[in-house]
Amino acid sequence: MKKNYYALAYYYLTRVDNPQLEIALHKELFKDLDVSCRIYISEQGINGQFSGYQPDAEHYMNWLRQRPGFSNVKFKIHHIEENIFPRVTVKYRKELVALGCDVDLTTQGKHISPKEWHEKLKENRCLVLDVRNNYEWKIGHFENAVLPDIQTFREFPEYAERLSKEHDPATTPVMMYCTGGIRCELYSSLLLEKGFKEVYQLDGGVIAYGQAVGTGKWRGKLFVFDDRLAVPIDETDTDVAPIAQCSHCGVGCDTYYNCANTDCNNLFICCEDCIDSTKGCCSQECSQAPRIRAFSPSRGNKPFRRMHLCEQVECEQVEKKASSCCCSCSH
């Protein structure tokens, strides 16, 4: 397939006086475009993940940069074959990154470019801190990075407190990174509040590093919050050796699935052989659960985010057997 679509990752912290207006304008614009997205807007700014047919994506980027306050938005672009989100989602979220605490965005770490980051890694002088969730860094991270065992963004403030006790903030330089950069905008401020004097953040995140440097000091793949789930950071180097293992047999693997037990639905890493033999379940216990989603190898590892998606798949399967479907879900 030709890669006629763009995947866009972007954020911009700026004062937005009327977030609801920006949301409404986004939704109106997208009505006639071949796009899908997950975009959050608040008084703090915008945080977006977007996919679209190339001309429509170009139109959106130009349109957003013409909106008051958004002229300096930087988009990180990947070439893809199709839309990677299930629908258009544009909504208000008070916290662009759900930390659960107030953060002083006027004090942040020093932004360094991907190439500066690459050179600084060679010095081996700083504590390299991965501020993503554990299921993200499990399949890919920088060499020798500190990998916090956290499962949600809200756990980072507590981790920052522990870090300040494990390392002397006055003498420990920190280099932090995340997927696209927005988490570091907030997390670097937290570390500065904890007394760390020298805090650097990778400008544009791992995505920008891959585009500017290539694989470099990165190992494995990058977890992304869309239908792809895992991608090489360098589009020209797709033969990436896995650093994770199948949760069932231990073979090298970096493919995530949602457990077919709809009451579990947890992400887990699994190889092709085991996902087939376990019918898509993460454990023996889940394979005996009362509500198990029919596993379809042809669907691949496309994520299930909500129960209604399970119901939709069931309806699609019924449609193949009958000329009509009487269910209430949309197709």
From Swiss-Prot:
InterPro entries: Rhodanese-like_dom, Rhodanese-like_dom_sf, Rhodanese_C, TrhO, TRHO_N
GO process annotations (BP): tRNA modification
Protein purpose: Catalyzes oxygen-dependent 5-hydroxyuridine (ho5U) modification at position 34 in tRNAs.
Protein name stated in the entry: tRNA uridine(34) hydroxylase
UniProt entry keywords in alphabetical sequence: Oxidoreductase, tRNA processing
Signal peptide (from-to): none
Pfam families: Rhodanese, Rhodanese_C, UPF0176_N
Protein origin, superkingdom: Bacteria
Span of domain Rhodanese: 122-218
Catalysis: reaction(s): uridine(34) in tRNA + AH2 + O2 = 5-hydroxyuridine(34) in tRNA + A + H2O
PROSITE patterns listed in its UniProt record: RHODANESE_3
GO MF: oxidoreductase activity, acting on paired donors, with incorporation or reduction of molecular oxygen
Enzyme class: oxidoreductase
Enzyme Commission number(s) from the entry: 1.14.-.-
Gene name of the encoded protein: trhO
Catalytic residues (positions): C178
Similarity comment: family membership: Belongs to the TrhO family.
